[in-house]
Amino acid sequence: MSADGLDYTNLLPIANVARIMKSALPENAKISKEAKDCVQDCVSEFISFVTGEASEQCTQEKRKTITGEDVLLALNTLGFENYAEVLKISLTKYREQQARSASMKETKQSRSEEPQ
């Protein structure tokens, strides 16, 4: 805990926050340090809030690993249904991409093992 009462170990890196903020704004827009700090605090707290809820679900089910479904359930439980819908689409696309990558890797590996 710092002198100002904040735990900086649980904050997202300010450079990452600023980069995401800039990507959502017009090219010539400026962002104050105060705005970056405020968003950094908010998104870090939001992640902790959702993760805590997802962790409770895991604990109830005697599991140790939080899954994408746990995060979706946490978002719905906490009243963030709109975010859950968008995240579900992203999670599906991510899993499809992972499956394609695994399939391509498997195909490449089996071809390299074939006798020539």
From Swiss-Prot:
Pfam families: CBFD_NFYB_HMF. Residues 12-18 bind DNA. CDD domains: HFD_NFYB. Keywords: Activator, DNA-binding, Nucleus, Transcription, Transcription regulation. It comes from the Eukaryota. One of its GO terms (molecular function) is protein heterodimerization activity. GO terms for cellular component: CCAAT-binding factor complex; chromatin. InterPro entries: CBFA_NFYB_domain, Histone-fold, Transc_fact_NFYB/HAP3, Transcrpt_fac_NFYB/HAP3_CS. One of its GO terms (biological process) is regulation of transcription by RNA polymerase II. It is found in: Nucleus. Gene3D superfamilies: Histone, subunit A. Residues 39-50 are annotated as: Subunit association domain (SAD). The keyword rRNA processing does not apply. Its main location: nucleus. Belongs to a heterotrimeric CCAAT-binding complex. Belongs to a complex that binds to the sequence CCAAT located upstream of genes involved in mitochondrial electron transport. Belongs to the NFYB/HAP3 subunit family. This is Transcriptional activator hap3. It comes from Schizosaccharomyces pombe (strain 972 / ATCC 24843). The gene is hap3.
